[in-house]
């Protein structure tokens, strides 16, 4: 994936590309805790917003999701009622300290799963070798939560294949595969990719970041993925994901509406209101 910037925080609240980065931190209004219980029609549907986004809590609530992750480990007190927080160990920084937080949350039942490193195969993301990632892996396993794999730029690349092969040799536990996908507005292409990943690793899948994108676009207006195409894609893919037994969770990535590559796939407009796409996701 191209056009990335590095976002490192003490407890690591990061994302996967520069278009995405600007989208997540652009809100300026102060958010208030979302206290109204959220009832999602799906126990798979999720949201990904860093808590550095001022309006993250209200956005998570507006999307009516079952779960949320922030690329970090803190279960913020503003988490909407009935939404399950899922922590992530983003990279190699402060792993031990982050895991102490996760362990404390797990012991009181606040978290039930743990996500592995964010795009360690990306130089502008976690940027870790396979062996380096494996060296930390026993610490993640020790928390004794269902553990998601590193979420690679491409889950079928040599980095991921090497990690899974060496993890198997060492007897390390990887309970489900985290997948990122930013292809065009072709739902069958994504379904084929998920089938490939499942066949490769024989694990359940969490589709933790996905949205149709045009990486050659210079503005949303020039994108080959129009808003209408993004909506059609969503209308096709969400019911299909619900029917796939091995897809346990999914989370649409909502970029800044001004993003050239991903703006037409945004769930919120510049005023922070649901787009037509966001309204469909919320009601699904």
Task: Give the label of every model feature segment.
Residues 5-12:
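Sec-dependent N-terminal signal peptides
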Residues 42-114, 131:
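N-terminal carbohydrate-binding/catalytic regions of secreted carbohydrate-active enzymes
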Residues 70, 87, 118, 160-220, ...:
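Aromatic- and acid-rich polysaccharide-binding/catalytic face
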Residues 57, 99-103, 130-144, 160-164, ...:
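Generic structural signal for well-ordered alpha-helices
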Residues 14-40:
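Bacterial Sec-dependent N-terminal signal peptides
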Residues 25, 81-91, 199, 224, ...:
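Aromatic-rich peripheral "rim/lid" segments of glycoside hydrolase catalytic domains that contact
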Residues 106-130, 136, 148-156, 172-181, ...:
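Active-site groove signature of glycoside hydrolases
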Residues 41-45, 63-67, 81-85, 109-113, ...:
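Loop/turn elements at helix/coil->beta-strand transitions in domains of secreted/extracellular proteins
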């Amino acid at each position: 994936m191209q056009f990335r910037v590095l976002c490192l925080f003490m407890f690591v609240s990061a994302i996967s590309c520069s278009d995405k980065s600007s989208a997540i931190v652009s809100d300026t209004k102060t958010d208030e805790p979302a206290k109204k219980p959220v009832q999602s029609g799906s126990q798979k549907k999720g949201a990904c917003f860093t808590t550095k986004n001022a309006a993250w809590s209200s956005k998570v609530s507006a999307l009516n999701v079952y779960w949320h992750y922030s690329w970090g480990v803190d279960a913020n007190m503003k988490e909407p009622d009935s939404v399950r927080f899922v922590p992530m160990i983003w990279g190699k920084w402060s792993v031990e300290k982050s895991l102490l937080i996760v362990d404390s949350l797990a012991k009181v039942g606040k978290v039930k799963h743990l996500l592995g490193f964010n795009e360690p195969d990306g130089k502008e993301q976690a940027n870790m070798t396979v062996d380096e990632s494996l060296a930390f892996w026993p610490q993640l396993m020790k928390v004794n939560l269902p553990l998601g794999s590193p979420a690679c730029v491409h889950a079928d690349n040599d980095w991921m294949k090497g990690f899974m092969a060496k993890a198997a040799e060492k007897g390390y536990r990887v309970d489900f595969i985290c997948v990122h996908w930013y292809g065009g507005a072709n739902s069958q292409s994504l379904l084929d990719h998920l089938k490939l990943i499942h066949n490769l690793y024989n694990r359940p899948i969490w589709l933790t970041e996905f949205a149709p994108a045009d990486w050659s676009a210079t503005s949303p207006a020039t994108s080959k993925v129009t808003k209408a195409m993004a909506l059609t894609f969503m209308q096709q893919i969400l019911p299909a994901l619900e029917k796939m037994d091995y897809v346990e969770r999914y989370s649409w990535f909502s970029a800044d509406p001004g993003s050239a590559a991903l703006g037409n796939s945004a769930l919120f407009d510049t005023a922070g209101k649901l787009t037509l796409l966001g309204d469909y996701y919320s009601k699904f």
